[in-house]
Amino acid sequence: MDTMITTPLILILITCGANSQTVKPDTASESDQPTWSNPLFTYPEGCTLDKLSKVNASQLRCPRIFDDENRGLIAYPTSIRSLSVGNDLGDIHTQGNHIHKVLYRTICSTGFFGGQTIEKALVKMKLSTKEAGAYDTTTAAALYFPAPRCQWYTDNVQNDLIFYYTTQKSVLRDPYTRDFLDSDFIGGKCTKSPCQTHWSNVVWMGDAGIPACDSSQEIKAHLFVDKISNRVVKATSYGHHPWGLHQACMIEFCGQQWIRTDLGDLISVVYNSGSEILSFPKCEDKTVGMRGNLDDFAYLDDLVKASESREECLEAHAEIISTNSVTPYLLSKFRSPHPGINDVYAMHKGSIYHGMCMTVAVDEVSKDRTTYRAHRATSFTKWERPFGDEWEGFHGLHGNNTTIIPDLEKYVAQYKMSMMEPMSIKSVPHPSILALYNETDVSGISIRKLDSFDLQSLHWSFWPTISALGGIPFVLLLAVAACCCWSGRPPTPSVPQSIPMYHLANRS
C-alpha cells in the first residue's frame, strides 16, 4: 500500500483511539442487536401524508448503513438518556404553513372587430417575513381569478386581485439548536419563525416546536467494549442507529455534561446497575447540532460497511437522474435496512415524496403479503399506504390484489415485472401553482415574476392581433384597395332602382 495513503489512515486510527474510554463493567449480557440490525425488512409506521413533501430526483439520498458486526466485542447492559429524539419521532416534526402572496391577474385584449383574447396569470409578489404575519390569510380553495375587464380596441387590460393564503407544511426541528430544518429554507435551516424560503413570495410560519433542553426517557441499551483493550466502541438500543464512541468527548449543554457521539448525538450513559457514569475527555469545541452534522468519517472505523449496498443505491440514483424515471425496484434501494428515524420515499402520480419517519423492523410477512409483524409485536399489521389507495406504498411497495415488495421479490425466481416498470418523474412545481379549477375561457395560465411581465408570452387570437398591428391603417388600406378595384370596373347600365348606399357600406 502507498505510504501516502497509509500514513493518514494510521493518524485517523490513533486519533480515534485517543478519546476512547476504558471501562470494566461487572456483568456481560447478550445483546439483541443482531435481531434488529439486519431484519428481514423495514417499513415506516405513522408516516402520514402531512409528513411528506415532493422532492426532485436530485434530492434523493442513499441511507447510511451501519456495520453491526460485534466480533471481538463484549456487550454490557446499560441505560442511556438522549438529548435527541431517541425512539420517539413526535418532537422532531414541527407543524406549520407556507404563506403565499400571489397576484391573480386576468388580461383581456380586444380587437377592432370585437374579438377577444383572455389570459390568466399568477404573478409572484415579494413577501417579507414581517408582512407574512400582518395580513389575514385564506385557504387555497378560496382563490379565484377576477372577471375580465375588457375595452374595445385595447390590448392587455388587466384586472388584479392579491391573495395571502396558506398551504400545510411540516418541517424538522433540531433538538439542540432549536433551528428549523428544511430544504425550502435558505441554507437549509432557519433560527426563528417566520422563515424566508427560496421563493420570494413564500414564507414559512410554524409553532414553537419542542422546548429546549428536553431529554428523552431512559432507554435500555447495551455498551460494547473491546475484549482486549477494554475500550468502549459503541452503544446500541432498539430503534436507533448505533452511537459510535470512537471520537466521543464530553460537552456541557443545557447546564449538564453530555457525551457527544461520533455523529453529534448528545447522550448520557450509566452502567454497573447505575453506579457508574461513562465519561470521556472534554471536547475541544462546543459544536452541537442534529446528528450527522459532525464528521461522518468517524464511522469509517468499523460502523459503516456494506459498500456494495451503498454503491447499488448510488448507481440507482445515477440511473434515476439520467433517465428522469424511476421503477419500484430502483426506489427500494433508498430504504434504510435499520429501524429508527430514517428518510422514507414514495412515488405517487409521477411525483417523488420524501419524509423523515419512524421505521420498524419487520420479522415476518404473511403468506398473502398483505400484512406484516413488526419486531416484538404479537399481531400482524396492514402496510400503510400514504396516499389512501391500495397501490402505492413506501420504497417501491405496490400492488392491489398482491402486494409486491421489491426487496423481497428480487429473491423470487419468477419475480413480478411490475417492479421494473418505469414511471416518468415530474419536476416539483413552484409551491404557489395549484390545480387551477375549471378554467375553460382562457387561452393560457402561467406564473410570472412581477418584474418580468412579458407581453410576448400572451396567446393571441386573430382579431386582437389586427389591433396590435394597427387596426385603423390596415382597414384604411383595405378601403383604398376596394375603391381602386371598384373604380377600375367598366360602367354598368343604369337601372330604374339603385341600391341604397348604406347597404353598400354594410357590406364593406
Curated annotation (Swiss-Prot):
Q: Name one GO cellular component term.
A: membrane
Q: Which coarse location class applies to the principal site listed for this UniProt protein?
A: virion
What are the UniProt keywords, alphabetically?
Answer: Glycoprotein, Host-virus interaction, Membrane, Signal, Transmembrane, Transmembrane helix, Viral attachment to host cell, Viral envelope protein, Virion, Virus entry into host cell
What InterPro entries is this protein classified in? Rhabdo_glycop_CD, Rhabdo_glycop_FD, Spike_prot
Report the subcellular localization.
Answer: Virion membrane
Residues listed as glycosylation sites in the UniProt record: 56, 400-401, 438
- Those parts of the protein on the Virion surface side are 21-461
Provide the transmembrane region boundaries.
Answer: 462-482
GO BP annotation list: symbiont entry into host cell; virion attachment to host cell
| Topology relative to the membrane | Single-pass type I membrane protein
Q: Which Pfam families match?
A: Rhabdo_glycop_CD, Rhabdo_glycop_FD
| Residues spanning the signal sequence | 1-20
Taxonomy, superkingdom: Viruses
Topological domain, Intravirion: which ranges? Answer: 483-508
UniProt similarity note: Belongs to the novirhabdovirus glycoprotein family.
Subunit structure, per the record?
A: Homotrimer.
Reported function: Binds to specific receptor at cellular surface, bringing about the attachment of the virus particle to the cell. Plays a major role in the determination of host range restriction and virulence. Class I viral fusion protein. Responsible for penetration of the viral nucleocapsid into the cell cytoplasm by mediating the fusion of the membrane of the endocytosed virus particle with the endosomal membrane. Low pH in endosomes induce an irreversible conformational change in G, releasing a fusion hydrophobic peptide.
Please report the name of this protein according to its UniProt entry: Glycoprotein
**What organism is listed for this UniProt entry?**
Infectious hematopoietic necrosis virus (strain WRAC) (IHNV)
